[in-house]
Amino acid sequence: MLDYRHCTLCPRACGVDRTAGERGFCQMPDHILAARAALHYWEEPLISGSFGSGAVFFSGCTLRCAFCQNGVISQENFGKEVSSQELRAAFERLIDEGCQNINLVTPTHFLPSILPALAPKLPVPVVYNCGGYESVETLRALEGLVDIYLPDFKYSDAALAKKLSAAPDYPQIASAAILEMYQQVGGAVIEDEQMTRGVIIRHLVLPGCIDNSLGVLDWIADNFPKKDVLVSLMSQYVPMGRAKKLPPFDRRITQEEYDAVLSYLYLLEL
């Protein structure tokens, strides 16, 4: 059972009693804080489609990435309190507005409050949009409720994960989590250019870290049938927050860096 009272929702397993006002790594309370619920057109085309993804951006995060592009939401507790009933109403409003899916963005640390809002089952796919740093036990509570998993796989390099996200165990945690996601939803199902089921793994190429990216792609190629899991290789790294003072992360990636990783992706036929 997912519970705030001895919180082990994420791999940090802080064990704090959030119902008593204690705060763990994510610094979140025992109720939802959400920053935004709106149609979102800037996800992968298979997710946003023509009509937008019904995205709910939850405050807080189980990671603390030095380069986070949503730091106000993820690290500065921006957002307003939302009940499970209000969250369900937001889902229904977004569906009425024509969304292609309901997109839960960084939801893990609020799951005890989110799960009631997912019942009864929604008439559109549910997307679980996360940083990849997930507990397998927590993910198992989502089986049958989530249709599409949209995790990051940020790091194959543990030292890099420690330096940039305070998570030296990220590679093994994300590996186990993504395997569980795939076990639940299986290979990609695409209907009318819209994803209805499956896993898309996102990877952001970081400056000066080509080997980290190649390691991520190697892991994907080694663990899934070709084209069963989709890969979204992202180039939009921008120095933000602490990264501005942390070379080489104080610069954008070069076209040559991105092309080197993209060529390897094609070589692996991902």
Regions found by a protein language model. Give the residues of each.
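Conserved alpha-helical substructure of the radical SAM core
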Residues: 72-101, 264
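Flexible, glycine- and charge-enriched loops at secondary-structure boundaries
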Residues: 80, 84, 167, 171, ...
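Long, low-complexity, intrinsically disordered polar/charged segments
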Residues: 39, 50-53, 58, 64-77, ...
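Conserved AdoMet/S-adenosylmethionine-binding subsite of the radical SAM
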Residues: 89-247
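Iron-sulfur (Fe-S) cluster-binding modules
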Residues: 1-9, 13, 230, 251-270
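Short, conserved acidic/polar surface loops in the N-terminal third of protein domains
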Residues: 66-70, 76-81, 114-117, 138-141
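Electropositive phosphate-/nucleotide-binding environments in soluble metabolic enzymes
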Residues: 4, 8, 20, 59, ...
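N-terminal [4Fe-4S]-dependent radical SAM core
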Residues: 1-62, 66, 70-75
